[in-house]
Each structure stands twice: as C-alpha cells, then as structure tokens.
Swiss-Prot record:
SUPFAM superfamilies: HAD-like. Its EC number is 3.1.-.-. This is Phosphatase MT3486. Transmembrane segments: none annotated. Belongs to the HAD-like hydrolase superfamily. The keyword Hydrolase applies. It comes from Mycobacterium tuberculosis (strain CDC 1551 / Oshkosh). GO terms for molecular function: hydrolase activity. PANTHER family: HALOACID DEHALOGENASE, TYPE II (AFU_ORTHOLOGUE AFUA_2G07750)-RELATED, HYDROLASE, HALOACID DELAHOGENASE-RELATED.
Amino acid sequence: MSISAVVFDRDGVLTSFDWTRAEEDVRRITGLPLEEIERRWGGWLNGLTIDDAFVETQPISEFLSSLARELELGSKARDELVRLDYMAFAQGYPDARPALEEARRRGLKVGVLTNNSLLVSARSLLQCAALHDLVDVVLSSQMIGAAKPDPRAYQAIAEALGVSTTSCLFFDDIADWVEGARCAGMRAYLVDRSGQTRDGVVRDLSSLGAILDGAGP
C-alpha cells in the first residue's frame, strides 16, 4: 500500500531536550530529582478527563502550583517554579523541519506520537521548536490511554490522521517502539543519530525523501 502519512516520535527524533539543565533547575528549586517530578506529573495527568487531556485545557501552571503546595515551598520558590520556562530546554533537530516540509510537499499527512509529556504539553514543545505548523495531529500516551509499543497507540494516531496503519511511515529512536509500529502494520525506521545507517535504520531524517521514493535504507 502507498504511503499516506508520516508519523514521528517527538523526543530524540524531531526534538532534543537539555536534561542536564532541566535537572539542575528543578532540583535547585524543589529539591527533587527530575524523575520524581515526572512521576508526579504523570499522576496529575491521569486525574484529567480524556477531553481535558486531549485539548490541553489544563495549563501546566496548575500542575506546578499544585506541586508547590504539596512541597510547601516558600513564596519565592513557588513563584520561580511556576515561571520556569521548560520550553527553553528544547530545540528542534536541524533535519526535522526539512523532513516535515518534504512530507507536506508530497501531500502527506503528518503526525507525532510521543510517550513523553514531561512538564510540557505534547504540542507546545513542537511550537517552541518551530515545528508545530507542519504537523496535523499530535498525540501523547496520556491522551490515548496506551503507550508505545501497545498496538492501540499506533492505531490511535492512524485513526486521528484518517488513514490506516498500513499506509503510515513511522520514525522512532527506540527499537522496541519501532518494532511495535511494524507489528501494527506500519513501515517503520529506527533513527540512530549516533550510529551508522543500515537496513531499517537511518542516522537522521534527511533520508525521508529517498525512503518515500523507494530508494532509501
């Protein structure tokens, strides 16, 4: 079947995140490691309704304010936590926007499927990385209620794009999630930015055009 849509993982494929800087700032303000903040963020998201999570009507400031109360932070630390700009830790890879533009130029739907929604909404980080205008649908595992490599995650993004899984081309930097996409019927590639191109593996997204032409890895 011909390709009708291209689906990308977000972190590690389209965007990178400076975890060291984020860890330093979060620990400095809260005294907690980033992993603990992530755990609490996941619990807070689970308390939202599906509609709230999907349209992202609950701003992150609500979570941070709630966290500050739980930790009994002083007013200065609370204000600093709420004002902390997590978007400043994120950026798009140089090959990301050209790949999205190539998909759009060919008339393909573009989706993003992420298991991560750490301290930022699924779409907001793409907006910070100047990629959001080229993406049709963004879904996170919290929105779906299933995470990669669960087949339901891949089915959800395909349905949201209005296509079948078998007409999707998929890119991820986690091997198990790539295999999950293949099991769901997608044509999938592992993005290994530190390794060498080999069968089913690409170094970055610059090979998207060649793959769509049938000449890629």
